[in-house]
C-alpha cells in the first residue's frame, strides 16, 4: 500500500505541471507593454527583488513594476541609449548589465551610477554585459561580449579578467552550480563548455561525449536543475542535457528533427522534471522524463495568446507566477492561481515600456522585476 501511495505521489508530481498547461487553447496570457507604462516592448532581462518589485530591463532603460504602476529609471549620462542585458540584486544594490558595461542602482539614494573599477592591468568593463551571477564566496561574475569574463570580489573590491582569447572574448553565460563550481559557455569560434580550475585559477574546456552525431554546443544559456543535471540551450542545436561529472551529453529538441527549438534564450525549472524554455519559436514546456513538450506561441486571432513568439527571459516570482520577456511584445504573465498569462507592451503613452523587444528579465533582492528592450523606433 505504501509503495502504491509513493507511486501515485510520483505520478502526480510529474503530471501536475503538465495539467496546468494542458489546455493550451484555453491559456490566457496577460500582456504588459508600452501601453501599460513600459519604456519598450523589447525585454532582455527580468528580476524580482526582496521587496517584491519586478525589475524589467529593456532596450530603452530600466523599469520597475510595483503591481500597479511602472516607473522608468534612467542611466547617468546615457541619454536614450540604455539597452539593458542583465540584472542581479545583492548587497542592497542592483547590478545592471548594459551594452556599455555595468551600472549600479542604490536603493538608499535611488541613484544609478556606472561601475568604474578597473583590473590590476587597468582594464574596465566597457562592452555588453549579458549575464551576472554570484558565487558562495561573495564574488560577482560578469560575462561580456568581447572582453571575456570578469570576477569581482565584493569583500576585497578586486576585479579580475579571464580573457578567453580563443573565443575572442565573446562569452554567452556563466553558471555557479550547487557545489560552487563555476561554468562558462561561448557560442563563438571554439564553442563549448568551460569549467574553472580553481587551483590554477583558469577556465579549461570541459569535454563532452555525445550519444549521436549532433556534436556542437553553441550554447547561449545554462541551467542546473534540482537533480544537479546541467542543461544547455543552444543557438541551433536544440536543448542539451549534460552530466557534469562524466561529460555525457544528450540532445533534445534539435531543429532538424522537425519538432525542435531554434535559438534558445532561456531555461527555467518550472517544477521537477519540467523545463520552461524561451526560444525564437515561442515558449516550450518540456518534460525531461517523457521527452514530450508543449509549444505556446503568438496567435493573431487570439488576443490572449502569447504576445510575441520571440521569448527571452523567464522567471518565477515569489508567489509562483511566471513572467516572460519577449523581443517585440513586452512582458507576459501567467498567474499561479488562474493559469492565465498577462503581458506588458509598448504604447504612445509616457508611462509605457520603451519598445516591443524584450531581451532579459531579472528579479532583485527587493522582489522587483527588471527587464531590457530596444527603442520602439527600431522595431
Residue ranges and their predicted role:
Residues 1-377:
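Carboxylate-rich, polar loop motifs that coordinate divalent cations or form catalytic acidic clusters
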Amino acid at each position: 500500500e505504501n509503495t502504491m501511495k509513493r507511486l501515485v505521489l510520483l505520478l502526480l508530481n510529474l503530471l501536475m505541471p503538465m495539467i496546468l498547461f494542458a489546455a493550451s487553447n484555453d491559456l490566457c496570457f496577460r500582456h504588459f507593454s508600452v501601453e501599460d507604462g513600459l519604456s519598450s516592448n523589447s525585454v532582455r532581462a527580468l528580476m524580482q527583488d526582496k521587496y517584491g518589485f519586478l525589475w524589467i530591463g529593456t532596450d530603452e532603460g530600466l523599469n520597475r513594476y510595483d503591481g500597479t504602476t511602472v516607473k522608468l529609471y534612467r542611466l547617468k549620462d546615457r541619454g536614450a541609449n540604455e539597452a539593458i542585458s542583465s540584472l542581479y540584486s545583492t548587497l542592497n544594490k542592483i547590478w545592471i548589465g548594459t551594452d556599455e558595461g555595468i551600472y549600479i542602482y542604490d536603493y538608499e539614494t535611488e541613484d544609478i551610477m556606472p561601475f568604474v573599477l578597473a583590473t590590476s592591468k587597468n582594464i574596465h568593463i566597457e562592452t555588453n554585459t549579458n549575464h551576472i551571477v554570484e558565487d558562495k564566496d561573495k564574488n560577482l561574475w560578469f560575462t561580456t561580449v568581447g572582453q571575456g569574463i570578469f570576477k569581482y570580489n565584493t569583500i576585497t573590491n578586486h576585479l579580475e579578467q579571464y580573457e578567453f582569447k580563443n573565443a575572442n572574448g565573446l562569452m554567452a553565460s556563466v553558471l555557479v552550480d550547487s557545489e560552487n563550481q563555476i561554468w562558462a559557455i561561448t557560442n563563438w569560434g571554439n564553442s563549448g563548455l568551460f569549467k574553472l580550475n580553481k587551483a590554477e585559477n583558469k577556465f579549461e574546456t570541459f569535454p563532452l561525449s555525445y550519444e549521436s552525431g549532433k556534436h556542437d554546443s553553441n550554447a547561449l544559456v545554462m541551467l542546473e536543475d534540482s537533480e544537479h543535471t546541467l542543461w544547455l540551450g543552444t543557438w541551433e542545436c536544440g536543448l542539451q542535457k549534460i552530466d557534469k561529472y562524466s561529460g555525457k551529453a544528450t540532445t533534445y529538441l534539435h531543429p532538424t528533427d522537425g519538432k525542435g527549438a531554434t535559438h534558445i534564450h532561456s531555461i527555467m525549472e518550472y517544477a521537477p522534471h519540467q523545463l520552461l524554455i524561451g526560444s525564437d519559436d515561442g515558449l516550450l514546456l518540456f518534460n525531461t522524463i517523457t521527452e514530450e513538450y508543449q509549444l505556446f506561441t503568438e496567435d493573431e486571432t487570439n488576443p490572449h495568446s502569447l504576445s510575441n513568439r520571440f521569448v527571452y527571459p523567464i522567471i518565477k516570482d515569489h508567489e509562483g507566477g511566471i513572467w516572460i520577456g519577449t523581443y517585440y511584445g513586452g512582458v507576459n504573465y501567467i498567474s499561479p492561481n488562474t493559469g492565465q498569462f498577462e503581458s506588458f507592451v509598448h504604447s504612445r503613452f509616457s508611462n509605457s515600456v520603451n519598445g516591443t523587444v524584450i531581451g532579459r528579465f531579472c528579479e532583485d533582492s527587493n522582489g522587483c522585476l527588471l527587464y531590457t528592450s530596444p527603442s520602439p523606433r527600431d522595431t
